[in-house]
């Protein structure tokens, strides 16, 4: 049965939760059926992977920033910035996930007759009880891909062809021994109400820059030039020898670009200082 609509709430007392949802009908008829999940706390880490139905190859870890405002305040967004690798994704965490999560996921889908080929995004939470899976996505993460793929040494087309052909085990997936940070430039007011159609200046600064990238999202080409056309407008990514240098470079590059209602968080990568 398809679930067409979902609503959620966090409740300390389970009886109060049942009464609020099923008796008081806080969510109307949507509350006739409930799914009760464990409430978890910890750092969230994103791990992308390639899968060919049997073999899974893990990419570098990344850490996203979902809230719209500095200090993780405001509404949830599609992601306001990210960095890779995550210093909290340790060798111990990696070994646990490889043993209990990654290959087990691929094997379980194959056993159900749902052999999967493509990208699996693992949304993990590092709890006191160990890594837990929060979500799966059958796609690259945005903006996670903007800090993971620039560090990948392999040809992306060759890797994707190996996923299709079932020869991923022959691919030696390699990543640069450095770091990358992405800062999203958004339209002020995102993710609620915002204006668009403003001319974007400074994009030419990225031409010929090996360690700097400008990824387009909410943009549109017009006769006057490229203008804003969405909430998240651009992803500004920079690489560095370590996370602190990459963060410094990324924020420097955000100053190359301007448009009338430009907005960004100023604390992307704040967890780097806590590692």
Set out the residue ranges of the language-model regions.
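Short acidic-glycine loop/turn motifs at beta-strand connectors
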Residues: 51-55, 126-130, 222-223, 239
